[in-house]
Amino acid sequence: MKIMIIQGPNVNMLGVREVGIYGAMKMEEIHEQMKLAASQNNVELDFFQSNFEGEIVDKIQECLGTVDGIIINAAGYTHTSVAIRDAIAAVALPTIEVHISNVYRREEFRQKSLIAPVCSGTIVGFGPFGYHLALMGIIQICEQIKNLRAMQQAQQTNK
């Protein structure tokens, strides 16, 4: 199983930027923790970070046929990007949206996600641990899909 982790604008500044909101852990440290959990679950991870909307859209499109699922923190683009929303919908892969802070306790404009309706799930407010929760969730979803396909294949074979 292969999962793409996509980090949006300013996520590369974790540990420096607004530590009171996002905590002191750097993006690279989050990725290292995810790699450890992934290795324990026989999962391969790829990581991508960009501050540019078009690059994020390109990366989502590249996921089609190459990964089993996506974990995305679209950061500020969560609230503004129809293009990212449409890319997620187009590839139709299991996708989990992650936010380190609880966006529902913050400014009103942060409380509306354009991408949530096309994601399998959303995890907010658990700090960096939210990425671990997202990883466990995407593994579960991908396993369910794999098992469903195997059952369908077996039914077709038995006809």
From Swiss-Prot:
The record marks 17 as: Transition state stabilizer. InterPro entries: DHquinase_II, DHquinase_II_CS, DHquinase_II_sf. GO terms for biological process: amino acid biosynthetic process; aromatic amino acid family biosynthetic process; chorismate biosynthetic process; quinate catabolic process. Pathway: Metabolic intermediate biosynthesis; chorismate biosynthesis; chorismate from D-erythrose 4-phosphate and phosphoenolpyruvate: step 3/7. It comes from Campylobacter jejuni subsp. jejuni serotype O:2 (strain ATCC 700819 / NCTC 11168). It comes from the Bacteria. Belongs to the type-II 3-dehydroquinase family. The active site is at residues 22, 99. The lineage of its organism: Bacteria, Pseudomonadati, Campylobacterota, Epsilonproteobacteria, Campylobacterales. Coiled coil: none annotated. Homododecamer. Keywords: Amino-acid biosynthesis, Aromatic amino acid biosynthesis, Lyase. This is 3-dehydroquinate dehydratase. It is an enzyme of class 4 (lyase). HAMAP family: AroQ. Substrate binds at residues 73, 79, 86, 100-101, 110. One of its GO terms (molecular function) is 3-dehydroquinate dehydratase activity. It catalyses: 3-dehydroquinate = 3-dehydroshikimate + H2O. Its EC number is 4.2.1.10.
